[in-house]
Structure formats: structure tokens, C-alpha cells
């Protein structure tokens, strides 16, 4: 970080010559000097060059107005105002809180001023670095000799082998040196929450509006289990979102708890909807408790917020209405909601305490903020027994954490602190809205078909768009007003083939074909539904990436309309089965898959498959125990009606469990089986389009098997 911007448009010798001297003095201290053309150019530079560490300007020309604009972008940026003897310094105490230092134009003072700028730059870096990351950097710079783990010893061991040297060169020196042992006492302990680790947790809690925060190094899958193990002791009953992540199914397999499922909605596109408000009411819960064997009043509830497709709840309503001691919002997909006013009241940590309740929010820091994979956080608001909670935390946390992951978690929080964090999220929202508008423009101008966007008909400024009962765009039936909102950052594109009400069109382009084309051109889709594709406009998405996606979509339309051969348009798919795809053209492929989906009446089948849950014969915990005792057998998929499932079955997408361990598909819930069979049939007919179904195993003959409990153990 060594870039200094100089606004040098003085036009007079007594101002320009001292600045020229300062330029030379700063270069001797290894600073790189840039000269913005004007105020707007400077602000663009600050926005686009995060390594800028100071701005030098003439006080008479720019004054406080420029300082205020820079401070809104980065309140810690050092500012150096040069004034002459006759300048008027009309500055209040409040103004002096900005990082402004004053110097006088004087020849021969450059060395002294440059040294002060170097000192201020060091202080700036020290100020913006969070505590653990700062301590880690300091330790690495000290270069101590250690006789403890890890065995590669700062990368030295790797360099004793040719292949190890290649590995070392790829990842670099600092990656190796920062991979250190928990024996390094000056960095404290992640497990004991001591030293700089404790300071990091306190820092994160302040940034995320939590009372207590924990860093988790094995993803939100682990964070969810930590919260669940503490909040739901064995023998208790828990309310769980049926659209939960599979980590919560694993929690139920590990802990002997009785689940009662919230039943979310789903529209014709297969987009996951929210849990209706009635599901949170005391009367509804009481009825479910009465209907569920061995259930007692729930002690804990888990809600996925946001949904995979970007729907956020009115969390204030849930916190107020839900009659349980603790509520866990699994917010893996929205770690940024504390940093824009459009998310107020739509996330777990918004607002203050809730009397008599503990609110948890787990977030995948790595998913949409800037952190290494597996970086996650647990935020807490309310009274918990910290010693007992830490037992659950230690149970699921390695004693050898990777300090790079831990430091990246803290750095992600530092990036979101203050005005800079708000600007990052505002930028993501702005880019996503521009992209949405561009898609709508291209659709309006296109001959024939083009992609559409799942959103209200008219969008303008930044907001989370409410799903209303009098609006048709969202495709959900009987929606509650002021309950669910669409996050602008989650962009779902629609392909031709299905209307909002689920009516199938004669012409269709299954989204999986578009996803394969985009993948051929270096663009990875987050999620693919039958006729929709999900794109995440995280803070790492810039204008170039957004334009590349637009270009690829228009290129797909052009190639599709030309009806190119599959082997030319989708070479990777062609290689899956060259003989099958040899003479096939893209329009034939699209129409054939579309007709297969239409044959199965996908919208109706999907609705029925998720409307009636399989019967819970035993808890996931009990079913898993039987599997561990070897009391399972494999049957073909079509034979699973009337059999108790041993494993969860979940298709990707969307990656939420369709059948839980211990559940049985009955005649009433047969549509669940028919939905799975449809997914398998598409893959059987068209090589390369197989659906990844966790819990179903494809055999050599192309048929799928599942694990069920042996008949004598279905008790």
C-alpha cells in the first residue's frame, strides 16, 4: 500500500516547486505518485484503487468539501492539505475528526513532510488492520524459529522436494509462513477465545451488531451444528425449516431430537418460497406437536433466511411471534445484510434484544463477502451460558485451525466496517439493478425470444422488493403481505418454456442447456432450475464480469437461433457421448428435453411433491443408529414406497432434503418418488444431464438404488 495522489493544479511557482520536491522525497521512500486530472478523477481513483493511502491537495482550491466527499468513501484515508501563510483555516472541532493534516508551502521542507506522511501511512495501515490479522502479520515478519507444528515449518519442508517446491511457488511465502501452530501464545487461542482471537471476535461482534460472535473454520455447516447442539438437547423438540441445509439434517442424525417441520411454499419455476406466517402461530405449532409422536413444546427453531433464491423474511414478525426460547436464522447466503438500510428488519441481528429469547445468526462469510472458503461466523443476541456453548463450539472445531481462514474472516469484517462497507454493498446492489434493467431492455429489443428476470415489472432504486398477494410476477399462491422480500443481489434469469402460473409453452429452452453453454465460456452459474438460472452479484462482481455475462447470454441466443450443432456449441457435452450427439442440433436438444419435462407435467408434479411430506416413522437420529448397526439394504428407487429411508435424499439443485432419514414414502406422498424418477429419466435419455441426487446411487444398468431399513427394523 504505497500510492499517494497529488492534486497539483496550482499554476504558481511557490506552490508547485514545494510539491515537486515532495514528489521526489516520497519516491525515495518507495511511494508511487499519481496525479488525478480533477476532483471527479480523484474520487474515481479512490473507488477503484484500494491501495491509495493518502491524498495531497491545495486547501485554498478544494477546502472541506473534498475532505467530506473522501471521508464518505473512506473515513480513515489520510488527507494532506497544503496552505500558504494567508490561507483561511475555517475548521471546526468536528471537521478535525477527519484525517486531515496541514502543511505549509515551503521550499526545503520536503524530507520532513515525506517522513511525516510515511509515519501517517503506517498509522493508517495500523488503524484499518483488525487485531488478529495485525498480530499475525507481525509474527510472520519477525521470522521466529519454531520447533512445533506444522511440519512444513513455514514452507521450508516443501522446498526440499521438487513437487513440494512447485507447490510452494504456487501458493507463495506468506501463505506458508502464516500457517502456524496454536503453540504460538502471542496470538491467543481460537478455542479458548483468548488474546488477539478474543479481540477479533469482539471486533466482529461490533461490526455485525451482535452481542457475541464466533469465528468458525469449517463452514456454516459446522456453525449450524454448534448452535443446534447447544440449543436443542437430546429429547427435545425442534422446529426446522423443511428447506433446511443438509447440515441441519446431519444435526438431527447426531442428536436425538424430534423435528417438527415448517412447510415452505414453492412456485412453478421450482423457486423456493418462504414459510407462511400461519406456520409461526402458536395454534399451528400446538396442532403439530399434538400430531407428532413423542413431541413436546419446541425449545428451538431454525429458519433459512434468506432462501437459496434470495427471499428474505420480515424477521421482526418471526422474532415477536414464534413462541420458542431460541431462534436460529441460517443466513449462510446473506452475510452482508447489516450493511445496507434496505435489509433493516430482514435479518437476525437487526434491531435490539428480544425479551426472553436468544437470536442466533449463522453466516457463510466466504460465500458473498471476501474471505477464504470455509470461513463462517456465529452471531448471538441474548443470554447464553458461554461455558456450555463453548463446549459445543470446541466439539466441532479443530485444534489446528488454519490461521489464514481465521484472519480472512476477521478481515472480511474489517472491510465491511464503516462507510467503506456500505459503499461495497451499495455497489453490488447498483450493479445488480443495472444488470436487471439491461436484461429487460434486451428482451424488449430482441427478435423472438430472450431471457427474462424474475422480479416485479417495474424496478427503480435500491430496495428489497416485497412479494404481495395482488402481484403475479412471483408465482406464489396465497402469499402473506409484508412477509417476504426479494434481495436485488440474487438475480434469477428465466428461460422460455414456462409461464408464471406454471402453464407450459410449446417452445422451451431448459436452463441446464444455457448453464452448460455459459460454463463452456468460463461463466459458472450458482444454481440451475428447470427454466431458471441464479446469479449472485457479490462484492467481487465488477462491471467487467457483468458485461461478460451479458455478452455470453446474447451469444447464446445468436448461436441457438442459428441452430448450430451440439458438438460445435457444447463441445464438453458432445464428449460425454459423441455417437449420441453427432448430428444433433441445439434446437432439437432443447425441444426434446422440454417435451420430456412437459410430458411429466413438471409444475404440477413439483407442487404435489413438496405439498405432502413423507411420513415420519422414526427420527433421523434413530434411523442413522440403525444404519450404523448395519440394519439397512438397498432397493431400486421405484421400490421405496412403503419402506423407511435410511439416508436423506436431496437433488442438486436446489440441495435441500426431499426425503429425511426415518421417513417413508406412502401412496399419499408418491409424487415425491415421481419427481425423483423424472429427474433420473432426463439423465437416462440425455447423457450429461444427469441430476446429482444425494442418497440415490446410479448402478451400471442406469437404474438408481436407495438405502432403506430392513423390514424387521421398521419399528
Listing of model-derived features with the role each one plays in the protein:
Residues 33-34, 213, 259, 525:
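Generic structural signal for residues in well-ordered beta-strands
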Residues 9-30, 37-57, 64, 70-77, ...:
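Non-catalytic terminal extensions of PLP-dependent enzymes
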Residues 174-222:
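Conserved N-terminal alpha-helix of the aminotransferase class I/II PLP-enzyme fold
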Residues 36-45, 58, 65-68, 76, ...:
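Conserved PLP-enzyme active-site core in the AAT-like
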Residues 216, 241, 262, 303-304, ...:
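Generic beta-strand/beta-sheet core signal
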Residues 1-4, 50, 210-211, 234-235, ...:
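A short, charged/proline- and glycine-enriched loop
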Residues 1-16, 238-241:
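Short hydrophobic beta-strand segments
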Residues 16-20, 198, 249:
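Short, surface-exposed alpha-helical segments at coil->helix boundaries
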Amino acid at each position: 500500500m504505497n500510492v499517494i495522489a497529488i492534486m497539483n493544479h496550482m499554476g504558481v511557482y511557490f506552490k508547485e516547486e514545494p510539491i515537486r520536491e515532495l514528489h521526489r522525497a516520497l519516491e525515495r521512500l518507495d511511494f508511487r505518485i499519481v496525479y488525478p486530472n480533477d476532483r471527479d478523477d480523484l474520487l474515481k481513483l479512490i473507488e477503484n484503487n484500494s491501495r491509495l493511502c493518502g491524498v495531497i491537495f491545495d486547501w485554498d482550491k478544494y477546502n472541506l468539501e473534498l475532505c467530506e466527499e473522501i471521508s464518505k468513501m473512506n473515513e480513515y484515508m489520510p488527507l494532506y492539505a497544503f496552505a500558504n501563510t494567508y490561507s483561511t483555516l475555517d475548521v471546526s472541532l468536528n471537521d478535525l475528526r477527519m484525517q486531515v493534516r496541514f502543511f505549509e508551502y515551503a521550499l526545503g521542507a520536503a524530507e520532513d513532510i515525506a517522513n511525516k506522511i510515511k509515519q501517517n501511512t503506517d498509522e493508517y495501515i495500523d488503524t484499518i488492520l483488525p487485531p488478529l490479522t495485525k498480530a499475525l502479520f507481525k509474527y510472520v515478519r519477525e521470522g521466529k524459529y519454531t520447533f512445533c507444528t506444522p511440519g512444513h515449518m513455514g514452507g521450508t519442508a516443501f522446498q526440499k522436494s521438487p513437487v513440494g517446491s512447485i507447490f510452494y511457488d504456487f501458493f507463495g511465502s506468506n501463505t506458508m509462513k502464516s500457517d502456524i501452530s496454536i503453540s504460538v501464545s502471542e496470538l491467543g487461542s481460537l478455542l479458548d477465545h483468548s488474546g488477539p482471537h478474543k479481540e477479533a471476535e469482539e471486533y466482529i461482534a461490533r461490526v455485525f451488531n451482535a452481542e457475541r460472535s464466533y469465528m468458525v473454520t469449517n463452514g456454516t455447516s459446522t456453525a449450524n451444528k454448534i448452535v443446534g447442539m447447544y440449543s436443542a438437547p437430546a429429547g427435545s423438540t425442534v422446529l426446522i425449516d423443511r428447506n433446511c441445509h443438509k447440515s441441519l439434517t446431519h444435526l438431527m442424525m447426531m442428536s436425538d431430537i424430534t423435528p417438527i417441520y415448517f412447510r415452505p411454499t414453492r412456485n412453478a419455476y421450482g423457486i423456493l418460497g418462504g414459510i407462511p406466517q400461519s406456520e409461526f402461530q402458536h395454534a399451528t405449532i400446538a396442532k403439530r406437536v399434538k400430531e407428532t409422536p413423542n413431541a413436546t413444546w419446541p425449545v428451538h427453531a431454525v429458519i433459512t433466511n434468506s432462501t437459496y433464491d434470495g427471499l428474505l423474511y420480515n424477521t421482526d414478525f418471526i422474532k415477536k411471534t414464534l413462541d420458542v426460547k431460541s431462534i436460529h436464522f441460517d443466513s449462510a447466503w446473506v452475510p452482508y445484510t447489516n450493511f445496507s438500510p434496505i435489509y433493516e428488519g430482514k435479518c437476525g441481528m437487526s434491531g435490539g434484544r428480544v425479551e426472553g429469547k436468544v437470536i442466533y445468526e449463522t453466516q457463510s462469510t466466504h460465500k458473498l463477502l471476501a474471505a477464504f472458503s470455509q470461513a463462517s461466523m456465529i452471531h448471538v443476541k441474548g443470554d447464553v451460558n458461554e461455558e456450555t456453548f463453548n463446549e459445543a463450539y470446541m466439539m466441532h472445531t479443530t485444534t489446528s485451525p488454519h490461521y489464514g481462514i481465521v484472519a480472512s474472516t476477521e478481515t472480511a469484517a474489517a472491510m465491511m466496517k464503516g462507510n467503506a462497507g456500505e459503499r461495497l454493498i451499495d455497489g453490488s446492489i447498483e450493479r445488480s439493478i443495472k444488470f436487471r434493467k439491461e436484461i429487460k431492455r434486451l428482451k424488449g429489443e430482441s427478435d423472438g425470444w430472450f431471457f427474462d428476470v424474475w422480479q416485479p415489472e417495474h424496478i427503480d432504486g435500491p430496495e428489497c422488493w416485497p412479494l404481495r398477494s395482488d402481484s403475479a410476477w412471483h408465482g406464489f399462491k396465497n402469499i402473506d403481505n409484508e412477509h417476504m422480500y426479494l434481495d436485488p443481489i440474487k438475480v434469477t434469469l428465466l428461460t422460455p418454456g414456462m409461464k408464471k402460473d406454471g402453464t407450459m409453452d410449446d417452445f422451451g429452452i431448459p436452463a441446464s442447456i444455457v448453464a452448460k453453454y455459459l460454463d463452456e465460456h468460463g461463466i459458472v452459474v450458482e444454481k440451475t432450475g428447470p427454466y431458471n438460472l441464479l446469479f449472485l452479484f457479490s462484492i467481487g462482481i465488477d462491471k467487467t464480469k457483468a458485461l461478460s455475462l451479458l455478452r455470453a447470454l446474447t451469444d447464446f441466443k445468436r448461436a441457438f437461433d442459428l441452430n448450430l450443432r451440439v458438438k460445435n456449441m457444447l463441445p464438453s457435452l458432445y464428449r460425454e457421448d459423441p455417437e449420441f450427439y453427432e448430428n444433433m442440433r441445439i434446437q432439437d436438444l432443447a425441444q426434446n428435453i422440454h417435451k420430456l419435462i412437459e410430458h411429466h407435467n413438471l409444475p404440477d408434479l413439483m407442487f404435489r411433491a413438496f405439498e405432502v411430506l413423507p411420513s415420519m416413522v422414526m427420527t433421523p437420529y434413530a434411523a442413522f443408529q440403525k444404519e450404523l448397526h448395519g440394519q439397512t439394504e438397498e432397493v431400486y428407487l421405484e421400490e421405496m414406497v412403503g419402506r423407511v429411508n435410511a439416508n436423506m435424499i436431496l437433488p442438486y439443485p436446489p440441495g435441500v432434503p426431499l426425503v429425511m432419514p426415518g421417513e417413508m414414502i406412502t401412496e399419499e406422498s408418491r409424487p415425491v418418488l415421481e419427481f425423483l424418477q423424472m429427474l433420473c429419466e432426463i439423465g437416462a435419455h440425455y447423457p450429461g444431464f444427469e441430476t446429482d441426487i444425494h442418497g440415490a446411487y446410479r448402478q451400471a444398468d442406469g437404474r438408481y438404488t436407495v438405502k432403506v431399513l430392513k423390514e424387521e427394523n421398521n419399528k
